[in-house]
Design a protein with these regions (language model features):
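N-terminal, charge-rich interaction modules
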Residues: 1-18
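Feature captures the catalytic cores and cofactor-binding loops of soluble hydro-lyases/lyases
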Residues: 22-23, 27, 31-46, 51-115
Length: 124
């Protein structure tokens, strides 16, 4: 599914990265914990979150995520948007909450991120 299709499905506003809306999204991951994003986000994944700080953009960049959707009408500050633009990470915002975003995307064919780990990997 292309990011432009996701924008329509989620009634989302593009905050930056209009030129990147033709990116192909293979899966999505919804979370508000950066530590879980670091464990589970794989390349070509769309991150859905209500966190708006600059750390989300840095995490998305490190994990090779293809974009970030902020839910609940939230928007990051100018520094996060500027960092995202320099990193070629599209940012979108929607008034829908996380649960509804995930449901809409799933119904429209986008699959959840399938990376898993067991407790032995996490705990050492």
């Amino acid at each position: 599914m292309k990011l432009s299709e996701i924008q329509k499905v989620l009634d989302a506003e593009v905050l930056c990265g209009n030129n990147l809306l033709q990116r192909e999204i293979r899966s999505c991951f919804a979370c508000d914990l950066i530590s879980e994003m670091l464990l589970y986000v794989t390349p070509d994944t769309l991150v859905i979150t209500s966190l708006t700080n600059i750390h989300i953009v840095h995490t998305a960049r490190v994990m090779d995520a293809v974009g970030v959707v902020f839910v609940g009408g939230k928007k990051p500050d100018a520094a996060a948007i500027m960092t995202s633009e320099m990193s070629d990470i599209p940012l979108l915002t929607t008034n829908h909450l996380i649960f509804e975003c995930c449901g809409r995307l799933f119904v429209n064919g986008l699959k959840p991120n399938k990376k898993t780990t067991d407790s032995a990997d996490v705990c050492g």
